[in-house]
């Protein structure tokens, strides 16, 4: 019976000591995994940031292309009625009273400067 007890005690001590070693090893392994996870998250954040910056650059390019190629906003041509307070006559034209009043419906028209 003593040999069984000694054997059982010996197996128990070995199991406990190996279990402790595994526990420390598991802690180190988990630490490594979390560090790898953090580095992966950092990499993913940088990749996403780079993609967003690329999209933003493309959008800004389109906006600048529009402003370069865009024509003048809608404007009123010569001889067309305009508003005295908000003259939207095309460049080179001025919103003035016509020389012959009463013929036209509105009192101001776009004329050359």
Swiss-Prot record:
<keyword id="KW-0800">Toxin</keyword>
<feature type="disulfide bond">
    <location>
        <begin position="75"/>
        <end position="90"/>
    </location>
</feature>
<keyword id="KW-1015">Disulfide bond</keyword>
<feature type="propeptide">
    <location>
        <begin position="22"/>
        <end position="74"/>
    </location>
</feature>
<keyword id="KW-0872">Ion channel impairing toxin</keyword>
<dbReference type="GO" id="GO:0005576">
    <property type="term" value="C:extracellular region"/>
</dbReference>
<dbReference type="InterPro" id="IPR012627">
    <property type="entry name" value="Toxin_22"/>
</dbReference>
<feature type="disulfide bond">
    <location>
        <begin position="89"/>
        <end position="110"/>
    </location>
</feature>
<feature type="signal peptide">
    <location>
        <begin position="1"/>
        <end position="21"/>
    </location>
</feature>
<comment type="similarity">
    <text>Belongs to the neurotoxin 14 (magi-1) family. 01 (HNTX-16) subfamily.</text>
</comment>
<keyword id="KW-0960">Knottin</keyword>
<keyword id="KW-0732">Signal</keyword>
<dbReference type="GO" id="GO:0090729">
    <property type="term" value="F:toxin activity"/>
</dbReference>
<keyword id="KW-0964">Secreted</keyword>
<protein>
    <recommendedName>
        <fullName>U11-theraphotoxin-Hhn1d</fullName>
    </recommendedName>
</protein>
<comment type="function">
    <text>Probable ion channel inhibitor.</text>
</comment>
<dbReference type="Pfam" id="PF08092">
    <property type="entry name" value="Toxin_22"/>
</dbReference>
<dbReference type="GO" id="GO:0019871">
    <property type="term" value="F:sodium channel inhibitor activity"/>
</dbReference>
<feature type="disulfide bond">
    <location>
        <begin position="82"/>
        <end position="95"/>
    </location>
</feature>
